[in-house]
Amino acid sequence: MSGGGPSGGGPGGSGRARTSSFAEPGGGGGGGGGGPGGSASGPGGTGGGKASVGAMGGGVGASSSGGGPGGSGGGGSGGPGAGTSFPPPGVKLGRDSGKVTTVVATLGQGPERSQEVAYTDIKVIGNGSFGVVYQARLAETRELVAIKKVLQDKRFKNRELQIMRKLDHCNIVRLRYFFYSSGEKKDELYLNLVLEYVPETVYRVARHFTKAKLTIPILYVKVYMYQLFRSLAYIHSQGVCHRDIKPQNLLVDPDTAVLKLCDFGSAKQLVRGEPNVSYICSRYYRAPELIFGATDYTSSIDVWSAGCVLAELLLGQPIFPGDSGVDQLVEIIKVLGTPTREQIREMNPNYTEFKFPQIKAHPWTKVFKSRTPPEAIALCSSLLEYTPSSRLSPLEACAHSFFDELRCLGTQLPNNRPLPPLFNFSAGELSIQPSLNAILIPPHLRSPAGTTTLTPSSQALTETPTSSDWQSTDATPTLTNSS
């Protein structure tokens, strides 16, 4: 579930409870081997829900109406105050459309500043083991928002909140505000993340075409995947790994084709040398090193997942539909062949002596339909590599020839609308891999001197953040979950 509401479908997540936040209310995540959760329609049933692990919300806690910043915990570093319950008692969700709920919330980005925020038209659009997602309308601007409400452990900072507060990119769902509210039980505290609302998900868009026995237009595949890779390049430059890339977590506006990555409930700032849990990411999209139990993985697990999403859009179904953790590896081997000893060592050195059945790789051209563009197949094969370091980086993927059509002047969406903003790179984005900039910036947006032309167009380079915007900073030391 997400800004777009519940979607159902998709594979189950990890065996521990997972927050499949926005796009999909989780059914029960499979235990142990991570069997498919729930039973809703779509390939693999519903994904499991995952409780947002990690750290509890930092900084000033904004209470519900009347509580004041910090509530009983006090302002500043005193922690969040519970305030009143949200939604308030007596509000009949979906019925009392004119009733206004007012809370004191903290701005999602920038300096910690609290203000009163009023909502109307509150209704549930998804739920799971992690909590509930509501849709609401801001009373002042009439803008729709999604409110993700999760039970908060007062001992920890909330990792999802910490990460979302530092992210600011056009292809990432924006945190507008956050506030805390009390629950029905004594000392129960909830964190409410107020997020921009995006109506659809890539999962539901793809399912629409599949049900109609149609193939999703290749230009939409290009536009969606390009924006996904751009969002990954940004978060990876911040040291953040999403760890749950799947179609259900890719929000899209069906009219403009703008894509926004959502659900950072599994995301983590990866630090070299520090171990991470391997049982992460929804099964169909899990990188092989995770299946091998690696704990020192890198952000390239997101690239593998993105490769699975690309393949799924091209095929009309998941490329690796494993029934369990072990079967997931079998599905991968059926396509890529048995990994070599060196590839296994790169994924997890502890498995080098394990005996695997020797299976030859299936030719990529036979994996996909005959009409699949060769550039799409080439990109897929460069993403779905056993060796993590051999996978393309997200920006290298953006620069791939598969996306050249997007860089051509005059290219439009199939609905005859202009392309969404694809080239409004910030200085920070252009500093990630400068050698790629000559490809990433289309010729028609370059000045004669070779620099980017500054124009009012949404396709041009516009923002220039300070260097501090691109520092990967750790949260204030506190008791935290290291998974």
UniProtKB/Swiss-Prot annotation:
<keyword id="KW-0119">Carbohydrate metabolism</keyword>
<keyword id="KW-0219">Diabetes mellitus</keyword>
<dbReference type="GO" id="GO:0030154">
    <property type="term" value="P:cell differentiation"/>
</dbReference>
<keyword id="KW-0321">Glycogen metabolism</keyword>
<dbReference type="GO" id="GO:0106071">
    <property type="term" value="P:positive regulation of adenylate cyclase-activating G protein-coupled receptor signaling pathway"/>
</dbReference>
<dbReference type="InterPro" id="IPR039192">
    <property type="entry name" value="STKc_GSK3"/>
</dbReference>
<comment type="subunit">
    <text>(Microbial infection) Interacts with M.tuberculosis PtpA.</text>
</comment>
<dbReference type="GO" id="GO:0046325">
    <property type="term" value="P:negative regulation of D-glucose import"/>
</dbReference>
<keyword id="KW-0723">Serine/threonine-protein kinase</keyword>
<keyword id="KW-0597">Phosphoprotein</keyword>
<feature type="modified residue" description="Phosphoserine; by PKB/AKT1">
    <location>
        <position position="21"/>
    </location>
</feature>
<dbReference type="GO" id="GO:0007399">
    <property type="term" value="P:nervous system development"/>
</dbReference>
<dbReference type="GO" id="GO:0010905">
    <property type="term" value="P:negative regulation of UDP-glucose catabolic process"/>
</dbReference>
<dbReference type="InterPro" id="IPR008271">
    <property type="entry name" value="Ser/Thr_kinase_AS"/>
</dbReference>
<dbReference type="GO" id="GO:0043525">
    <property type="term" value="P:positive regulation of neuron apoptotic process"/>
</dbReference>
<dbReference type="GO" id="GO:0097192">
    <property type="term" value="P:extrinsic apoptotic signaling pathway in absence of ligand"/>
</dbReference>
<dbReference type="GO" id="GO:0048156">
    <property type="term" value="F:tau protein binding"/>
</dbReference>
<comment type="function">
    <text>Constitutively active protein kinase that acts as a negative regulator in the hormonal control of glucose homeostasis, Wnt signaling and regulation of transcription factors and microtubules, by phosphorylating and inactivating glycogen synthase (GYS1 or GYS2), CTNNB1/beta-catenin, APC and AXIN1. Requires primed phosphorylation of the majority of its substrates. Contributes to insulin regulation of glycogen synthesis by phosphorylating and inhibiting GYS1 activity and hence glycogen synthesis. Regulates glycogen metabolism in liver, but not in muscle.</text>
</comment>
<dbReference type="GO" id="GO:0071285">
    <property type="term" value="P:cellular response to lithium ion"/>
</dbReference>
<dbReference type="GO" id="GO:0032869">
    <property type="term" value="P:cellular response to insulin stimulus"/>
</dbReference>
<dbReference type="GO" id="GO:0036016">
    <property type="term" value="P:cellular response to interleukin-3"/>
</dbReference>
<dbReference type="GO" id="GO:0098794">
    <property type="term" value="C:postsynapse"/>
</dbReference>
<feature type="modified residue" description="Phosphoserine">
    <location>
        <position position="72"/>
    </location>
</feature>
<keyword id="KW-0808">Transferase</keyword>
<keyword id="KW-0026">Alzheimer disease</keyword>
<dbReference type="GO" id="GO:0045944">
    <property type="term" value="P:positive regulation of transcription by RNA polymerase II"/>
</dbReference>
<keyword id="KW-0879">Wnt signaling pathway</keyword>
<dbReference type="GO" id="GO:1903955">
    <property type="term" value="P:positive regulation of protein targeting to mitochondrion"/>
</dbReference>
<dbReference type="GO" id="GO:0010975">
    <property type="term" value="P:regulation of neuron projection development"/>
</dbReference>
<dbReference type="GO" id="GO:0071879">
    <property type="term" value="P:positive regulation of adenylate cyclase-activating adrenergic receptor signaling pathway"/>
</dbReference>
<dbReference type="GO" id="GO:0043025">
    <property type="term" value="C:neuronal cell body"/>
</dbReference>
<dbReference type="GO" id="GO:0060079">
    <property type="term" value="P:excitatory postsynaptic potential"/>
</dbReference>
<dbReference type="GO" id="GO:1990635">
    <property type="term" value="C:proximal dendrite"/>
</dbReference>
<dbReference type="GO" id="GO:0043161">
    <property type="term" value="P:proteasome-mediated ubiquitin-dependent protein catabolic process"/>
</dbReference>
<dbReference type="GO" id="GO:1901030">
    <property type="term" value="P:positive regulation of mitochondrial outer membrane permeabilization involved in apoptotic signaling pathway"/>
</dbReference>
<dbReference type="GO" id="GO:1902004">
    <property type="term" value="P:positive regulation of amyloid-beta formation"/>
</dbReference>
<dbReference type="GO" id="GO:0007212">
    <property type="term" value="P:G protein-coupled dopamine receptor signaling pathway"/>
</dbReference>
<dbReference type="GO" id="GO:0003214">
    <property type="term" value="P:cardiac left ventricle morphogenesis"/>
</dbReference>
<dbReference type="GO" id="GO:0046627">
    <property type="term" value="P:negative regulation of insulin receptor signaling pathway"/>
</dbReference>
<dbReference type="GO" id="GO:0032436">
    <property type="term" value="P:positive regulation of proteasomal ubiquitin-dependent protein catabolic process"/>
</dbReference>
<dbReference type="GO" id="GO:0045719">
    <property type="term" value="P:negative regulation of glycogen biosynthetic process"/>
</dbReference>
<dbReference type="GO" id="GO:0030877">
    <property type="term" value="C:beta-catenin destruction complex"/>
</dbReference>
